Amino acid sequence: MGKTKHQGPISTTKLPQPKHWVSPVPFGLGKVKPKHIRDTMKVAWENKDNLGYASRILTQGVCDGCALGVSGLYDQTLKGPHMCTTRLNVLRLSTMPAIKSEILHADIDELRKYDSTELRQLGRIPYPMIRRKGERKFSRITWDEAMDMIANKMKKLNPKQYAFYLTSRGITNESYYVAAKVARFLGTNHIDNASRICHSPSKTAMKRSVGVGASTANYQDWIGTDVLVFWGSVASNSSPVSTKYMLEAKKRGTKIIVINPHREPAMDKYWIPSNLESALFGTKVADDFYQVSIGGDIAFMFGIMKHWFEMEENQPGSAINHSFVKEHVNGYEELKTHAKAQNWDEIEKSSGVTKERIIELAETLAKSKNAVYTWAMGLTMHSFATDNISQVANLALLRGHLGRKHNGLMPFRGHSSVQGSGEMGADPFVLPGGEFDEKNRERIEKVWGFEIQKWQGDIVGVTLENIVLPEEHERKVKLYYMSGGNFLETMPDPDFVKKALSELDIRVHQDIILNTSTLVDAKEAVIVLPAKTRYEQEGGGTSTSTERMVYFSPEIQGNKNEIKEARAEWKIYVDLAKRVKPETAHLIDFKTGQEIRDEIAIANPNYNGIQHLKKKGDVFQWGGAWLCEDGICPTPDGRANLIPVEIPDFGKKEEQFVLTTRRGKQFNSMIYKEVDPFNGAGRYDVLINPEDAKELRVADGEAIVVHNGFGVFQGKAKFADIARKNLGVHFPEGNFLLPRGRYEKYAGIPDYNIAVYVEKAERFNARKDTQYQEKEIADDLDISPPA
């Protein structure tokens, strides 16, 4: 899709630039900031029983934390070693010993006293286990017993009645691919992955806008572009090494713009531990913040476009790249008419930003020859998320910010190799190399040698709802096979999720650790299978980064705490398939990771090159340095598409707030610090604008209640620089306020934003009888979910 190859890592600017310093006072003394040196020493202490193996993981393996793709200590963006706390925090998952048997086989209610953080710290799952209906403890079983029980159950079920789910906690492309193939081999299309609750709208929107659901740019494009826009992203928190790229970009003249309801401290200033200058004096990251209200991004972008078209009336070519649009873009006149028809009053009301401020950014972008637009959960976790992303693409296309150096669209991924999950086919809407459509299905059937069922598989949220369907329904899910994941802490309406998980006949947890969902009952049995980490996978494996770099991570020897009964994830899937359909097992019987990579290169032509990755440091980038290079997109006519979208109605009443969930110091739902080191917020603190708190007569730190017709959240007010009538609570603690069944209309992502009421706890508790409070909230206040 692009002819230019990535140039490899570049050198950093050596001379200090004090204008980017936070303070001349060294080490951020007196500032609220992470304690990186202390945290690093703590990690070393935690891994002291397996320090050699931990060191080899860090120096030889590909990071299993975020999606930057650091291989060993190096990457393809900047020369020099890289290390971050995200990677260090997940390190212990690969080095720790097994859970002690007296804890593992304790009464289930004793295990349920642990939260997920405490369960994670107990150690790894040592061997296959089962807990049948009515049993109070997990019992050890053999692999044969476990796999036969799962296979025999599947043989009795309609394939529409079992499902697979994979989450990206270090899962390799090989495992994703085999899982996708095995699911279809067994006759089910119910397979989904963690991107369903993060970036599925990005893929959907980019496919319709530019023809490809992946980043069109690479990280080096940040460095030297005129403007780098972060939309709904706290990249410095989720992927700390990215701050090195930001610092280098600033030194080369890049202006960094952050668009987010909350002025995230980590995007304001950061101390980069692996850069001496930044570690000493800090780095001022963002040059400007635009605090758009939750759900107001589409209106905000319409304001930018509206001003561009007003600029064009006075001076043609002052805002729109007409040559690029004429040669490479469809739908210009339709979008122009639609944008000009938008009303400034509605734009300001929806976005929460004044016309004057919107015009500032519009003119900045209009003057910028180059720009990279990157975004994350702040744009994708909405019921209108696909439209959010298409609107970002509209901005880039109108300016011609696509398909060349220092330009592009970049969905900022948060999990290692989650980019590869869909590209390997572990998604109900895709198969390797393309969509789940007739043409691609027939192509893959020839590669795989068996027929693929034509019916549409379900997304994870619908699969959970299908568990509670009537017994006779053909899509009532009775067996759920999960590689990692904890739906109790990632999906809306945790009470319903717990009920659904308990109504499965058999639930399989293939994982390295226990979590709270593992301890939920099932109607027949809960089966737990010990998986190997990516560093233990025989022959190594690959992972795909945000920028489409496919890295080889070698098998790393010498684990003193080796889990002898753990198996590579892809091998477990192969074993299952052979037991369910032994008569055609030869079609799925991979023996090595190399065999899998050889087939991936055929099944997904973009991955032609993966078969040559064999040792540490091996890497290739599918699609070249820039997708849509020279404006030529992988669409039927080779042109990009401008998509007119509508400003969404959030359904908020005047007295309500809009609440969003946010991450603190955590990796996905795995929490590593109870207090956010960037802003001092505890897990049950509610970020609120001081002016809003004043109107509610609430003091900083005072107990408040956030409620709606779906749930109640009791916390404390935490004054923060957040947009008016917006609230922030931590994920997953705030998930009780989110109802099930509200999905993004194109990609099926759950909506993680909701309208709520806020009041002092003493007033709430005085007004509501505890026994009936949720019923009374719904009845007395007549609350309905937002549209």
What do these predicted regions represent?
Residues A146-Y162, A217-D226, A249-R252, H338, ...:
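Glycine-rich phosphate/diphosphate-binding loops that line cofactor/substrate pockets in enzymes
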Residues M96-E110, L119-R120, G253, M267-S368:
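Long, well-ordered, tryptophan-enriched scaffold segments
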Residues H105, D109, R132-R136, D287, ...:
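N-terminal leader/propeptide and maturation segments of large enzyme subunits in energy/redox metabolism
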Residues Q121, A179-M246, R252-L276, A396-A525, ...:
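Extended redox/cofactor-interaction regions of prokaryotic respiratory oxidoreductases
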Residues V90-K137, M147, E174:
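Low-complexity, highly charged intrinsically disordered N-terminal segments
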Residues M1-G69:
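Intrinsically disordered, low-structural-confidence terminal and linker regions
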